[in-house]
């Protein structure tokens, strides 16, 4: 027989590299990194976040539900879904920890979207939560500026603009 060949080694995906950089930066400034389930229940994805029953994010056309409606709870809304954000990890963490809280929760999220240049039914997201005494919007701004300058370049200019996103 012929001698064996050296196995071809792949490369890490660019999004994996960026995610690791994001996690490393936040760890360096004292944040804990949380990983959580991609299959989520209605409570952690919507209810515990005070999203009302008629919130647009709960619609079947926006959320990828996985099971039949929960008849036992007398609702027509299914109870298991692919998470639409990583906020469920914040709820899980706060159920078992008291402030101060300094966490980020990166991960894949899913939404019923028609793929185009700016939309995908599956994408990466990072959410952060900082809770403690004397935390202000200045802390948010400083954290974001520190993160972006470390990720991109120290000369990166950061501008924050208030906006409204009906999904969130």
Q: Which stretches of residues belong to each language-model region?
A:
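TRNA-recognition modules of translation machinery and tRNA-sensing kinases, especially anticodon-binding
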Residues: 1-168
């Amino acid at each position: 027989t012929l001698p064996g060949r050296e196995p071809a080694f792949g490369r890490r995906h660019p999004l994996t590299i960026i995610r690791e950089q994001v996690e490393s930066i936040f760890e360096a400034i004292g944040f804990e990194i949380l990983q959580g389930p991609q299959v989520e229940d209605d409570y952690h994805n919507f209810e515990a976040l005070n999203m009302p029953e008629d919130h647009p994010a709960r619609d079947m056309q926006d959320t990828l539900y996985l099971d039949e409606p929960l008849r036992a709870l007398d609702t027509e809304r299914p109870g298991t879904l692919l998470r639409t954000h990583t906020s469920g990890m914040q709820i899980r963490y706060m159920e078992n920890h008291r402030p101060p809280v300094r966490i980020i929760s990166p991960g894949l999220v899913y939404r019923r979207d028609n793929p185009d240049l700016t939309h995908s039914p599956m994408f990466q997201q990072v959410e952060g939560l900082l809770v403690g005494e004397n935390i202000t919007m200045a802390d948010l701004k400083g954290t974001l500026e520190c993160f972006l300058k470390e990720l991109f370049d120290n000369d990166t200019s950061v501008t924050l603009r208030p906006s409204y996103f009906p999904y969130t």
